[in-house]
Amino acid sequence: DCCAALKFVWDNHASLHIDPHKIAVGGDSAGGCLAAVCAQWSRDHAHIPLCFQMLIYPVTDVRMMTPSMKKYKDSPFWNAGLNKKMWDIYLRNYPGKCPPYASPMQAEDLSDLPDAYIETEEFDCLRDEGILYAKKLCEADIQVQENRVKGTFHGFDFFDHAAIAEEMISIRINALKKAFK
């Protein structure tokens, strides 16, 4: 659905009054996963020249083997147990295998993807896989603005009036403004 929506925007950018050089994808948590794989799919199949990808505490690896995934097994709000359930539901039609464009870290080639902003939270089971995905993008010569936010947890920005949430939202907005210049 995400890729179809992106293709619709691309195919109809003129009637939608959208600059075709200022199309980005983004999401948080599972939405970050969808945005990342949508960028990969777009490069490989739709040839849509995305200008940016914004990945906020993204799910990136179906294997769930990082130290933070093992450490935050039962933390409140989001944890490894809930993450496992998410993957089980997401991949329920693919027993025993992970299809292409499901787990961003499984991609063999990350070259020619759009620049990225990747934010990870200190007390999040997804922290390490987000950091590893940022590293893998950098190794593919993708420009990454990585933001490892101290003292935060998965979904902290739900409390949007908290000072740290306001600060991170401002940083995200500035990253988008820079991408859209």
Language model region names:
Residues 1-181:
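Alpha/beta-hydrolase superfamily serine-hydrolase fold, recognizing
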